[in-house]
Amino acid sequence: CLEENYLDREAPNMHVAFFDIEVDFDPARGFSKPADPFMPITSITLYLQWSEQLITIAVPPKTLTLEEAQDSVKDFDNTYIVETEAQLLETFLGVIEDADVLSGWNSEGYDIPYTVSRIQKVLSKDDSRKMCLWNLPPRKRKFERFGNEEVTYDLIGRVHLDYMQLYRKYTYEER
């Protein structure tokens, strides 16, 4: 158990953030993959465990104006409609600034590499350093999944835990 590593000391109070991204769909090309993130991120939802806040940041769907989209979410706390993907990514980076741990479902194989790639494409490679601590860049790493080699990023100084992998590892299943 992890708490045994603290040698009878109280475990630190970590700021844990869970997040999930949604990506636009291209009817001609289909869903984009982290290796080729050609479609924009349209929304990011985060749960900040330390403040018990659920936050959603989104760009308006193509069928609504900015004002119509903002009006449609006015009754939802902590739901923010921004004009562009760049604003969405900048807001996301600001929200996770205090997070010690970042987690999501299938985040190693999708959300982390897709988000880092979109930040580098839409904002700048330098801005992707905000995913890490100490102004260090995310470290590209290859891993194997379902017999295929895929790429993800390690977030230097910030712990990343893929909740899907944790679930698979620690959930009892009869074999």
Language-model features and meaning:
Residues 57-174:
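Conserved DEDDh/DEDDy metal-dependent 3′-5′ exonuclease domain
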